[in-house]
């Protein structure tokens, strides 16, 4: 028996596109002699549809298209994730569901029992937990189907279960021979190995081969990495799909496979591929085929430019240098050299005259006051204004270039360098930016070495460096990880060996700059706690650094 694992990249709410992907994949599976094709969680609608689920017309269309899809595909049974209505008289109105489609109709269906409500997940807002998982017979084998979170309640892999029920235990007590999990599980650093650990635990514990079919593609801030897997009954990984690309795996149940050992690329390679896919999908799914990047000659804009070029192609990327009176010659040279290395269009628009015009206009109002960060921010806002004008005129998406460390500290300017439609590296700490830049330069230098090696500077005043107002990035990123990822208290972070005054300053700035981050463009989520939908803090609050 052959089973096709169809790792597709859906567009949320684009039924025509998603059905086209499903039809093409089922045709490939049928041609390859497969007995069953499997598609990811909510593959008909795309995940996560968020408040589209509150629109009755959207649910109606989803059900209409599901029945239409069933009638169009013949000759191969398949599993498809979709949204069903809750037939019960109480609870939330919807179910996160999966259907077995065979012979032109929905033959059987089941649903998701465990609904995540943490970080970026908010499924209890819309869905009622399903009463039944899907179980069906396939060539004298009993197949059980779970949906994403249903397999994440395994105590063996990381402490105590977080749910009262265990869908897997219930399925295995019913005697399933094959376990399938359809997922829309977003990427974070090192999540792939964790998923594999769970699958291995399940397969070995229940002596059941386990299939994992994951969505791929970028949907807003979330990156779905695919990496679908098949683990045999002994817990050995025997098949694995591409990371960050559509794929179709075929598992032959009668074939003997060698174990795949150490399947994961380096962290830098994985993060870079995720950012490239996320930038491409966000741009194209939003209708943009061209992007703009402001090139300062620094490492952050260089990193974003490389990602943009690899995501969109050199012909669809323009780099803009906007030197001020404080921009060094080496910054101007490095910006142009980078653009040449990437083969992207390069334009230079000096801002000297505009900057002086601003200062002249404000001269009387600012009479007697010393120049400070106000004048620095004027430069950033001039640049933001020019970039948005170019975006507007040429229909290109502006990519902002701030990293996570700077955004955490408010070391950025509202309506200036924060301008844009997508914050590509807003979840990349500065120390990781350096790691990515060095990775990009292997084996051939793309980002000028001087850009990486010289002290980082916003160049908004003479002889400025980032460390004039920020701790060294190794220290800053360590404190931020402790506070944001590990949720450690002030005292616990100090006990790690950091200076109390430094910790207090970092946590205070993290708190007071919430208002800036609320106005930032959406950013691509890479870590387990990014700024955005999964981190919800009040703006007007006490300043005690918890």
Give residue spans per PLM region.
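Enzyme catalytic cores with a strong preference for nitrogen-chemistry domains
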Residues: 1-294, 310-314, 321, 346
